[in-house]
A protein has these predicted regions:
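N-terminal cap/lid segment of alpha/beta-hydrolase-fold proteins
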Residues: 1-22
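The serine-hydrolase catalytic nucleophile loop
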Residues: 35-47, 181
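Hydrolase active-site cap/lid region
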Residues: 110-150
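Alpha/beta-hydrolase active-site loop
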Residues: 74-91
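Short beta-strand/loop motif that positions the catalytic acidic residue
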Residues: 163, 169-171, 175
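Short alpha-helix in the alpha/beta-hydrolase fold that links the catalytic acid
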Residues: 44, 165, 179-189
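Catalytic histidine-centered segment of alpha/beta-hydrolase-like enzymes
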Residues: 204-215
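Conserved alpha/beta-hydrolase
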Residues: 50-69
Length: 231
């Protein structure tokens, strides 16, 4: 990948580590990684593909991840969105496309409305009840999201019902974390989207989907087309 411009963004007494790549196109992707051991490097392959086609991108390591470090339990869904906004402001970018993996998909979904993006890519999307939004990660957060089907009353359905851009939802057929019902319902909810597609990757689990997608010409094309490119 071309050398990205590193960013060190002050945020609530710490520094967020991020980077941005410029492109000639007016299109710009912002990637939000998931929880666990994930970090912004998960987007490297897609960002390289976009950069080769003139599209810039930005990604960050949220608090508790990657170079940013810190304690995951000191963050929350709400604070992750605040971190994304801080990086966007520092980089001076207003993305046309948001992409999120797992937990990051919920951040992308909620931010899509206020940023009025043209495209939304949700990969193995984690969806949450609004009750969990401000709760710090830890036992209380876990107790909320572990309630059976707690995601049913998520605000995600209404947000996508208002979304008018391009939507790509990607699921792993063998995902043991995110039930297939969630990506199916997200796709179905986007009744006003200008374009919507659901990809279910055969045999895939919850992690490692992006390299698989990029290695498959048809799935790779779906990613590019959602961002706004002709494959």
């Amino acid at each position: 990948m071309s050398s990205p411009v590193p960013l060190r963004v002050p945020f609530q007494g710490r520094e967020l580590h991020a980077d941005t790549l410029s492109g000639d196109s007016p299109l710009h992707l912002f990637g939000i990684h998931g929880g666990g051991a994930s970090n912004r490097s998960v987007w490297d392959g897609l960002r390289q593909s976009l950069w080769q086609r003139g599209v810039g991108s930005t990604a960050l390591d949220c608090v508790g991840h990657g170079q940013t470090g810190g304690v995951f339990a000191e963050s929350s869904l709400q604070r992750r969105s605040h971190q994304v906004r801080s990086v966007m402001a520092s980089a001076g970018v207003r993305p046309t496309a948001l992409a999120g993996i797992s937990m990051g998909a919920y951040n992308a979904l909620r931010l899509s409305e206020e940023l009025d993006v043209q495209a939304l890519i949700l990969i193995v999307p984690g969806i949450y009840t609004p009750e969990a939004h401000e709760v710090p990660f830890g036992p209380d957060f876990s107790a909320i999201i572990r309630r059976p089907r707690s995601w049913v009353d998520s605000d995600a359905w209404d947000i996508l019902g208002r979304f008018r851009g391009r939507l790509l939802v990607i699921a792993g057929e063998q995902d043991s974390v995110i039930p297939l019902e969630i990506p199916e319902r997200l796709h179905a909810a986007a009744t006003r989207a200008s374009r919507r597609e659901l990809l279910v990757v055969p045999g895939a689990g919850h992690s490692g989907l992006l390299p698989v997608l990029l290695d498959n010409p048809q799935w790779h094309a779906s990613l590019l087309e959602c961002v706004g490119l002709e494959a």
